[in-house]
């Protein structure tokens, strides 16, 4: 872990931008307690890796047990020992099959295990989250149940920003031969490339789009889908594994920014049922347009390599999400006939920097402040929430003052229409108890949210009323 940490620090794009690495660990891994303290300020500094972003993969079983009784025991194992003794990798399974194999490991006396109370594990997770903002959350069973390409593999984890959820597999050396070529001795390796996931991202600026106009939205979404598909051909690939995977799956990540902006200009409050209903329709419309556009591209250029047998081809994708209207049924038939150009379509990235350039709000988060000063190259630049006026001022409620259950419920509604995941931040104050933070995690799991990004904490003690300050 130290080596990974130092690599992230060393690879800094010629001093312009420090590298960043997210490390995902299963919640049943034997080293979990130490892993959860990688970035905390207390403890042995030799065991720290402050420049790594830790993330934890959770099965449904863990959250069910945490909800039912925190005093239950949870058992941690060494994955290598499981492979040696049992002959399988526990991480290669999910859902009911994973639970059966996990309980088989629990009951096998040949395996050494580290047992802890779920309460103790949850306490470590939440303390780290409140203190450092991490670990990120990856709900493994939720992700893999919704995977439209489960026929080709499994999704083990997400990326640095928790919005990517695509099949992945390891790069394997099949054989190594020592040969002689032109009098020289050479080593020839035969390598199986695996699935090396690549991000091809773009975002719709919701605050600047006519979201109610179905025709215009279809046109704009289709344009972005085509552009992202072209990026796959035009891109520079520093390693061949990335190129191979990108051309096999042709995965893209169409996202969204300006979410709070779009609500504010329509006078829709974040903490309202109107918000949930409106964005449910918006993201269903975006999803429909993206699928239709990808299918048209498949008709024009051909389907992605693994389309046959996918949920797109069988129609299971539409059935799982309850898309039963005549329009959706017609699209399902069209997709089954024409194919899909892209294996994965939607992923909501954080867009914290690009949203400022676009003059809108970041990702799907509420604004942190209505106005603030941003430091850029030694200068302080004033920034204000987009379209800030007497009509939108009170609509722009600070993220730290917003009831986070509304943000999570909204994420759950959006998730139905997003085949990958979302960069969902939780905003808490020092007044939150650990139990309240745990309840947010449980609510996210219950709402079908696949991932949780940062837990951003802030004290309210020195806050001044913005409308009264002068």
Positions of PLM-derived features:
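Catalytic alpha/beta core of large soluble enzyme barrels
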Residues: 162-166, 228, 232-233, 317, ...
């Amino acid at each position: 872990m130290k080596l990974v940490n130092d690599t992230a620090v060393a690879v800094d794009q010629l001093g312009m931008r420090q590298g960043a690495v997210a490390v995902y660990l299963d919640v049943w891994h034997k080293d979990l307690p130490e892993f959860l303290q990688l970035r905390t300020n207390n403890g042995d500094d030799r065991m720290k890796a402050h420049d790594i972003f830790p993330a934890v993969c959770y099965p449904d079983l863990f959250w069910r047990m945490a909800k039912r009784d925190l005093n239950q025991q949870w058992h941690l194992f060494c994955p290598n020992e499981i492979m040696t003794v049992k002959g399988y990798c526990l991480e290669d399974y999910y859902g009911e099959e994973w639970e059966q194999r996990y309980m088989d490991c629990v009951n096998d006396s040949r395996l050494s295990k580290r047992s802890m109370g779920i309460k103790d594990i949850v306490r470590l997770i939440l303390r780290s989250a409140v203190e450092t903002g991490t670990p990120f959350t990856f709900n493994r069973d939720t992700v893999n149940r919704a995977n439209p390409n489960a026929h080709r593999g499994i999704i083990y984890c997400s990326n640095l920003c928790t919005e990517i959820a695509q099949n992945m597999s390891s790069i394997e050396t099949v054989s190594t031969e020592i040969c002689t070529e032109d009098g020289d001795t050479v080593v020839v390796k035969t390598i199986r490339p695996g699935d090396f996931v690549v991000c091809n991202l773009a975002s719709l600026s919701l605050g600047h789009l006519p979201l109610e106009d179905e025709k215009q939205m279809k046109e704009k979404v289709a344009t972005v889908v085509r552009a992202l598909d072209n990026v796959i051909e035009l891109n520079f690939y520093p390693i061949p594994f990335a190129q191979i995977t990108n051309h096999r799956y042709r995965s893209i990540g169409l996202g969204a920014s300006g979410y709070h902006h779009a609500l504010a200009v329509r006078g829709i409050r974040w903490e309202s049922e109107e918000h949930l209903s409106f964005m449910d329709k918006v993201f269903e419309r975006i999803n429909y347009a993206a699928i239709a556009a990808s299918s048209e591209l498949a008709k024009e250029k051909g389907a992605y390599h693994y389309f046959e047998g996918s949920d797109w081809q069988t129609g299971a994708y539409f059935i799982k999400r309850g898309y039963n209207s005549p329009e959706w049924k017609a699209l399902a038939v069209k997709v089954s006939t024409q194919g899909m150009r892209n294996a994965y379509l939607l992923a909501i990235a954080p867009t914290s920097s690009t949203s400022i350039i676009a003059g809108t709000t970041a990702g799907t988060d509420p604004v942190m402040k209505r106005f603030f000063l941003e430091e850029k190259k030694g200068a302080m630049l004033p920034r204000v929430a987009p379209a800030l006026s007497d009509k939108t001022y009170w609509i722009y409620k600070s993220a730290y003052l917003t009831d986070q259950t509304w943000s999570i419920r909204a994420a759950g509604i959006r998730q139905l229409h997003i085949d990958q995941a979302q960069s969902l931040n939780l905003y808490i104050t020092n007044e939150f108890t650990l139990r309240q933070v745990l309840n947010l995690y449980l609510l996210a799991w219950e709402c079908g949210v696949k991932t949780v990004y940062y837990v951003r904490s802030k004290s309210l003690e020195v806050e001044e009323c913005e409308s009264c300050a002068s």
